[in-house]
Amino acid sequence: MKFLERLQRPLAICALILAFGGIAAAEEPKKPELLVLAAASLTNVLGELSADWEKSTGVPAKLSFAASSVLARQIEAGGTADVFISADQEWMDYLQARDLIDKASRRNLVGNRLVLIAPADSQLKLKIEPGFKLADALGKGRLATGDPDTVPVGRYARSALTTLGVWDEIADRLVRADNVRSAMMFVSRGEVPLGIVYATDAAVDSKVRVVDTFPANTHAPITYPAAALSAAKPEAAAFVAFLAGEKARAAWRKFGFVEITN
């Protein structure tokens, strides 16, 4: 009998330890996780910046990339998220007009440039200027860019080509991609001879090369606004401030983005 008592006592103690340990674990607050919806052209740089943010704050940021139009519609439809980063002002304005973002948190992060690209092995030389021979350069091929009706890069492309007087010649020869990375893929795979994308996208794909850069005065400034959503976690505004702050500048420069003044 005494033997059983001696055996049961440590077992009871272990059970109590496990029970209290389970309660402590259950009561430990769960760390917040931010869901960031961002324009596809930010894929590489935000991967690095989100890691820096988590390292300094302990708050992970889960990233989801698509065309700004797709993400804005997703938010409007009630999709759960904390931060939205657009490739143009229009889609951010769209959400702000519907009170879906925290206006006070809104920041313009960086800028970009618009470029004409070709497959890396292309020998094409073409200077972008008023009336330049884009249609001739395409030959029987097509031009890939974002859908001008919805995708920011496509809107910038249409504006630039209209300003230069060549839009009407190629408007019916577009491959209308759903985001800038998809547009670039058509060129990198050699499916089309030319495409219009952002300079930062061209810089990360060795299978394409920049033919020329569009003059900045041919289109609206390419800027990336960011904001916390109205129903976001408290850390969302701090994440936006981090992206717009001094600590993030080195990463933005590394990936070729243009510094701007808010």
PLM feature spans:
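Exported/periplasmic ABC-transporter solute-binding proteins
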Residues: 25-79, 86-89, 93-112, 117-262
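Bacterial N-terminal signal peptides
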Residues: 2, 10-22
